[in-house]
Design a protein with these regions (language model features):
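Long amphipathic alpha-helical segments
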Residues: 1-63
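C-terminal regulatory/effector modules of DNA-binding transcriptional regulators
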Residues: 37-40, 46-194
Length: 194
């Protein structure tokens, strides 16, 4: 039943409205209900599977990008896990016009730097959702910043990105913990690059 509701909503709403006004609140609601014990584990898994299927179909529809658009690498550091939120950020970025290289979750920091230089990315987006290992992740983010080309920007996303506020001034790293702010930052960077 959720599949049908999601499909109908996708057909009616624009991609950004669907993600920001409909899907993100739905994911938050599911997480809240699970944490309160009002939803069974199996129900949560089935709901998230429907949402992931919906996001994958959106991702496939938006995959074609122009040859000359700005490039972005998105992934997460070691000990991080994939989140539906990360997939929503990917779709928002594609909708703005970025060419995305998604390298997945649990990627060593030097491999993220290598991927960014290989595709000549203008932006690296790191998803941080796991509250553990903050000191190690700060070291790894600093390493990525130091090895990045001068033209590369870095944006931290995810539920735990606020824990890294001290990096914003020290290393010129942006933090975006909501989809609307992320979209606005991408649009601004896109206009500066083009």
């Amino acid at each position: 039943k959720l599949d049908n509701v999601l499909s109908n909503s996708m057909a009616i709403l624009s991609t950004n409205d669907f993600l920001i006004e409909y899907l993100k609140p739905l994911v938050n609601y599911i997480q809240d209900e699970c944490s309160k014990g009002n939803m069974r584990y199996a129900q949560e898994k089935m709901s998230k599977l429907c949402i992931r299927t919906c996001l994958n179909s959106l991702y496939v529809k938006l995959r074609s990008s122009k040859e000359d658009c700005p490039r972005m690498v998105i992934g997460s550091l070691i000990s991080e896990y994939e989140s539906l939120d990360t997939l929503m950020h990917i779709i928002v970025a594609q909708n703005v016009g970025w060419d995305i290289t998604y390298i997945g979750n649990g990627v060593p920091h030097d491999e993220i730097s290598y991927a960014a230089s290989t595709v000549r990315a203008q932006l690296v987006v790191l998803a941080i959702n796991n509250p553990r290992d903050i000191a190690r992740k700060i070291y790894e983010i600093r390493h990525i910043r130091k090895n990045a080309e001068k033209t590369e920007d870095i944006i931290l996303i995810g539920s735990q990105c606020s824990e890294y506020r001290q990096l914003t001034n020290e290393f010129n790293i942006n933090i975006s913990n909501e989809l609307t702010a992320f979209r606005l930052k991408l649009e601004r960077l896109y206009s500066l690059i083009r």
